[in-house]
From Swiss-Prot:
Induction, as annotated: During nodulation in legume roots after Rhizobium infection.
Sequence ranges of Pro residues compositional bias: 56-67, 248-276, 283-302
Native source organism of the sequence: Glycine max
A biological process from GO: nodulation
Keywords associated with the record: Nodulation, Repeat, Signal
The name this protein goes by in its record: Early nodulin-75
Domain of life: Eukaryota
Disordered: annotated span: 56-309
Keyword flag Signal: yes
Signal peptide: 1-25
Biased composition (Basic and acidic residues): 81-210, 219-247
Main function: Involved in early stages of root nodule development.
Gene behind the chain: ENOD2A
Record flagged with keyword Repeat: yes
Amino acid sequence: MTSVLHYSLLLLLLGVVILTTPVLANLKPRFFYEPPPIEKPPTYEPPPFYKPPYYPPPVHHPPPEYQPPHEKTPPEYLPPPHEKPPPEYLPPHEKPPPEYQPPHEKPPHENPPPEHQPPHEKPPEHQPPHEKPPPEYEPPHEKPPPEYQPPHEKPPPEYQPPHEKPPPEYQPPHEKPPPEHQPPHEKPPEHQPPHEKPPPEYQPPHEKPPPEYQPPQEKPPHEKPPPEYQPPHEKPPPEHQPPHEKPPPVYPPPYEKPPPVYEPPYEKPPPVVYPPPHEKPPIYEPPPLEKPPVYNPPPYGRYPPSKKN
């Protein structure tokens, strides 16, 4: 509570000091009478004559005559280049329809009889296989309608059973002749019973006689005889050869670029100068009329009244 009271008292004192300082500064004690200062009456000066500022008249440019920019006369009509007249109608590479021919029909696979015609015999001479007579003059890429000839057809041979061999003599397939008097898989006579051995003498089964004493699988110690003195891996001195001396390598000259061919710096072509678009000249507008400032003399002349009262 005391701190709050002290704080409020300090604020009040500061406010009183701030408010009273300008009042005390203006208060001056008057010990004697000071008459008011005598001033000369103000001389009348007429107001200055208003001169409007001089504006130069705008330069008048006559409107340019209209010229269409870079218009060429239309050229005379010329047919487009590289155009050939339409050729007459010709069916490209059309062959006449041939007569009916059975396409690639082979005769039935019938072999001639092996008796009087051995296989792989050529047909008679009057029909050479696969030989066509020399045709008459034919234009290129056009074949005349040939006469009807069945392509690749042999004359019908006599009746031959296809792929039939004559019946061979009777031979039982894969039969061995009967062997001599030894019936297979026959047991021997009774006086020798099969797989019966006579009773052997008494022998202990699988018993070996006691061998002489031998140390079981003992190897002698690996003792090598003392080797003769040999210098370990010493090579004889080679003949005088410079050890691993390579010939001085031939260094190629450093890569040098060839002098570049002089090329003038790339210069852009001068831009096409187009005429400026038609612009209307600006309409002359006179400057707005400004009223001259009215001179109002101060009510107390040139100088303001003194503040000394």
